[in-house]
Each structure stands twice: as structure tokens, then as C-alpha cells.
Amino acid sequence: MNIWQSTSIITWLLAPFSLLFWLVSQIRLFLFRKKILKSYRSPVPVLVVGNISVGGNGKTPVVVWLVEQLQQRGVKVGVISRGYGGKSKDFPQLVTNQSSAEMVGDEPVLIVQRTGVPLAISANRQQSIELLLNQFKLDLIVTDDGLQHYALQRDIEWVVVDGIRRFGNGFVLPAGGLRELPSRLQSVQAIICNGGKAQPNEHLMTLEPEFAVNLRTGEQKPITDFIGQECVAIAGIGHPPRFFNMLENLGVKLLKTQGFADHQAFEPAQLKALAAEQIPLLMTEKDAVKCRTFAQQNWWYVPVSAKFSPESTACLLEPILKRLGK
């Protein structure tokens, strides 16, 4: 939300509630650390990929990148997710290539389709881990989000920061967009900066598109084929302008853009009304998993891949591999 990027009279009116939010979260964290509130220790190491702010920071591309890197190095990895946006009430549940994004959430389906990783969803992280370990022999559990879920003990914490928006106005909810203060970053093992300019203690990540995929046929086109072409773009992610800016920076001529709420379910008529049949409709990969069943001929999704420097790649992976004895 733009209101969280600066301070205004609304910020100060909400500040007392932010103070209350911060106090409650600190008391809760203290109770977990003192073992007054129970937490679960997984039989295998747990790595959390999370953030300290709300909105799209790029966690899912990091999870996909991490899983692929570990798979290439022989690590048997599983992923757990809350399954935000899904309607299913059957938990815990394994997600497969045939799972419906409407039922289990868009991000879990995307991760499984990209990596083939064993993935379970549930609000109860312990149940998800136990389900995975009962069915797969795993070396490591990666949790997509859940930095503030202190009922799950963790061995490694990565935090993804939006390199453009950073920490907004610096307030926690509801006066600002932070779940925890930036001082929380002092205790994590890695800070990943998504775009913008990374600080000295951060690893810069870029999200790079290489091609577009037709939702109906699976045909792939180089993304350069859309340079100068008139298109319409939609994005139902945490921060839609990031996707639109990426397309415009590539040279795509956007006639219209439409942002939707993160994890929002789409109605066919809702999207068909946005673009004439001859105009390409571009969307994110996360949106595509919800639209394939009613996609039109000229609908395309643009997958992005996380890219790190060789130095950052080594710095991020070596502590994990060392811990696992790989």
C-alpha cells in the first residue's frame, strides 16, 4: 500500500495500534524463546524463507531457485507452505502437478510445477513436516513464508527485502507495512535484496524473464518478440507494479494494466473484458495457474527466474551444504 511508504496524519493516528502490535509480537517471541509457549523441532533441518513486511517481496522465486540449486547438488528437499488463497479444508495435504490452485493456493502449485519438489500445505507446520517425512526421505525442509511462525523451530533464516520499497515508513502494522522492525535482520543468516541497490550485508537478486508461455498451447516465445507490441497486462501478486515495470523496461507497450489482490481468484469474464481477442494478455506465472482452464488463445504468462552472482550463490548455499554434510 502506498500509504505505508511515507508518513501522514493517518500514520500517526494509527501509531498507537502499531505500538500495541509490536508489544504483543515481542511478548509472544519472548514466550517462545523461554519455552513457555511450545514449539516444534523437526527431525531434519528447517530453512525459512520469509520477510519482515507484508506484500510481494519475491519469496516464491527465491524458494524455486533454492530448491533447484539444492536438487542439482543431490539434496533431498521438501517444502511446506500455508497454502494462502486455497479453499481446501483438508489439511495437511500434498500438492501435486494435478492439484487445483483454487483449492491449495497458487504459490504451492507454481513451486511444484517448476521443481517437482515434495510439498505439503497446512496452517500447522508440524503436520506438514510430519506428512512429508512419512512419505519421503528428506535432508532439509524449506518453508515458504513463516518467519514469524515461532511455533516452528528453525535452523536457518533467509529474509527477502524489496530493494525499491525497502521498509516503507518504518512503522509496523497497521501504521506501516512491517511485521517486525528492521533490527530483526541482525539475527538472520541471509538478507536477499530483490532489485534496487543491495546494502553491504545483502545479496542482490534480480528476477529475469526469458520467454513467454501460451496458456492454451504451451508454446514458448522469446520475451523479445513482444518488444514494441501493444499488450494488456494483469498481476495478482503482492506488488503488481513490479511486473508491469519489468514489461515496460523490456520495451513492451502496455495499453492497459490491472492489478489484483494477492492470491485473488479470477472470474473468466473478468479477464476476458480486459483485452480484445487480438491483443496479447500478459500475466505472471502465479496468475497462470489459476487461469489455464478458461484461457483464451492470446493469453501468455511470463515466468521469471531468480539470478544471483556466483559469490552470492556460494555464500548462500555453502552453510546449508556444510550443515547437511554435503
UniProtKB/Swiss-Prot annotation:
<dbReference type="InterPro" id="IPR003758">
    <property type="entry name" value="LpxK"/>
</dbReference>
<dbReference type="GO" id="GO:0005524">
    <property type="term" value="F:ATP binding"/>
</dbReference>
<keyword id="KW-0441">Lipid A biosynthesis</keyword>
<comment type="pathway">
    <text>Glycolipid biosynthesis; lipid IV(A) biosynthesis; lipid IV(A) from (3R)-3-hydroxytetradecanoyl-[acyl-carrier-protein] and UDP-N-acetyl-alpha-D-glucosamine: step 6/6.</text>
</comment>
<dbReference type="GO" id="GO:0005886">
    <property type="term" value="C:plasma membrane"/>
</dbReference>
<dbReference type="GO" id="GO:0009245">
    <property type="term" value="P:lipid A biosynthetic process"/>
</dbReference>
<dbReference type="GO" id="GO:0009029">
    <property type="term" value="F:tetraacyldisaccharide 4'-kinase activity"/>
</dbReference>
<keyword id="KW-0444">Lipid biosynthesis</keyword>
<keyword id="KW-0443">Lipid metabolism</keyword>
<keyword id="KW-0808">Transferase</keyword>
<dbReference type="GO" id="GO:0009244">
    <property type="term" value="P:lipopolysaccharide core region biosynthetic process"/>
</dbReference>
<dbReference type="Pfam" id="PF02606">
    <property type="entry name" value="LpxK"/>
</dbReference>
<protein>
    <recommendedName>
        <fullName>Tetraacyldisaccharide 4'-kinase</fullName>
        <ecNumber>2.7.1.130</ecNumber>
    </recommendedName>
</protein>
<comment type="similarity">
    <text>Belongs to the LpxK family.</text>
</comment>
<dbReference type="InterPro" id="IPR027417">
    <property type="entry name" value="P-loop_NTPase"/>
</dbReference>
<comment type="function">
    <text>Transfers the gamma-phosphate of ATP to the 4'-position of a tetraacyldisaccharide 1-phosphate intermediate (termed DS-1-P) to form tetraacyldisaccharide 1,4'-bis-phosphate (lipid IVA).</text>
</comment>
<keyword id="KW-0418">Kinase</keyword>
<keyword id="KW-0547">Nucleotide-binding</keyword>
<keyword id="KW-0067">ATP-binding</keyword>
<feature type="binding site">
    <location>
        <begin position="53"/>
        <end position="60"/>
    </location>
    <ligand>
        <name>ATP</name>
    </ligand>
</feature>
